[in-house]
Amino acid sequence: MLLRYLKSYIYNSVAELRDTSFFDEEDIRNSEYNIKRNWYYNNENMPDLYGKKATITDETWFTTFRLYPALTKFFYGRSENLSLTGSYRDRMKFRLSETYLLLCEARLGLNDISGAREAINVVRRRAHAPEITDSEMTMDFLLDERIRELVGEESRRFTLCRTGKLLERTRKYNTESGPVMRDYHTLWPIPQSIIDSNTGAEFPQNEGY
């Protein structure tokens, strides 16, 4: 999957995103204009490499420092500051496409499969992705579609908790956290300071902590 790890989009010393066949071939959200995978040497002090494409393989991508791939929705690539690890580009807070995806989720909750399919296909048509049928319309497909549409934007944990899929999908797709995920991890521990400050009644800790 494009999101190999669900780590709240916190950068560390290795790339967190990996490209696979997660998108349909026609889907423009997977284009080089949206997800940059091709990088070229631009250091004039390296004449043997200058202008040539950097080679990133399946064996080396994971150790490529904050590079592969990059989401251009957040990335300026301004030549005056090549060391810039972020950008000042505005972040989307509300998007029409997510409204349709939320409508799809609501209709799934009502078991209105055709209505859910109609809602998600509005987003897929705009992305030039093939429309899906009722038989393909599942909560898992919707969660995958949210990755394709909102990668880097949504608070994924909240989405997975809301849909009751946190444990299942973390254990299935997250090779780092999945093996140690426990049922009680759907909730976080309540800070002890909050518990202590509640003097009017007993304030129990969440189970497992």
List PLM regions with ranges.
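Amphipathic alpha-helical interaction segments
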Residues: Y41, P47, L108, L166, ...
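Intrinsically disordered, low-complexity segments enriched in polar/charged small residues
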Residues: L71, R78, Y100, D112, ...
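Extended, hydrophobic/aromatic-rich amphipathic alpha-helical segments that build helical scaffolds
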Residues: D27-Y33, R91-V123, M139-E149
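Flexible, polar/acidic helix-loop-strand segments at domain edges
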Residues: M1-R95
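Long, intrinsically disordered, low-complexity segments
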Residues: M1, G86, D90-K93, R124, ...
